Structures are given as C-alpha cells and as structure tokens.
Amino acid sequence: KLKQAYFVDIVPEVAEKCSAELQEKLGFAVESVAMDDRKSAVRKSDIVFTVTTGSQELVYFDWLKPGTFVARLGSYQEVHLDVITRADKVILDRWKYVSPRIPEVIQLIEE
C-alpha cells in the first residue's frame, strides 16, 4: 500500500498545486519537491515514474535504492544511461515502437 509520494516539477507552483490535488484524490501524503531536491525524493522512493517531454536527465542510477522500479513515460531521455544499462530487468511493451527511441536498449542487446 502506498503511503507517501513525491511530485517534482521545474515550476515549484505547479509541483505544489499538483501535489495538493493528488493528495486529496489519493488519500495519502504527496509532497512537492523542488527540482534541485529531486535526488532526495528519488533516494527515498521504491517506485519512480518520469513523465516529461524534456531531454534533461532527471534520475541517475546511484540515486536508486536496490529493487527500485523505474517507469519512463515521457521523452525516454529523462534517466541517465546507467539506469537502463545497469538495471536488473528492462521491460518493453512494443519493440518496433520502443527500439528506435531508446538506443540504450540496442546497446544492451549488443553487449
């Protein structure tokens, strides 16, 4: 059962608004986190979702606890290469759609 969530956005006001809305809907604590403080939120998390259209790396492998589940739902560029290449498992839905967008997966296969 989820007990805590963190919401990060490049615009602090957006993070605060979305956190408040989600907390009301979900019924558990949702804390807004400044972009510069995202490392601390990732380190405390068992599940990390990234949803962005940006190309900035937002999550790094050494921030993750062992066993953390990471779902990339955005631009496919929001995690550092090591998050993919050092993962225990990489799960894809449709190869023909994903393979051209995620060169790290091709790199894993070639290794």
Task: Walk through the language-model features, giving the residues of each.
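Rossmann-fold NAD(P)-binding glycine/threonine-rich loop
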Residues: 63-111
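Rossmann-like NAD(P)-binding element
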Residues: 31-59, 63-64, 68-78
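Generic secondary-structure signature for well-ordered alpha-helical cores
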Residues: 20-27, 47, 75, 95-96, ...
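NAD(P)-binding Rossmann-fold cofactor-contacting core
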Residues: 2-26
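A structural micro-motif
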Residues: 3, 28-30, 68, 88
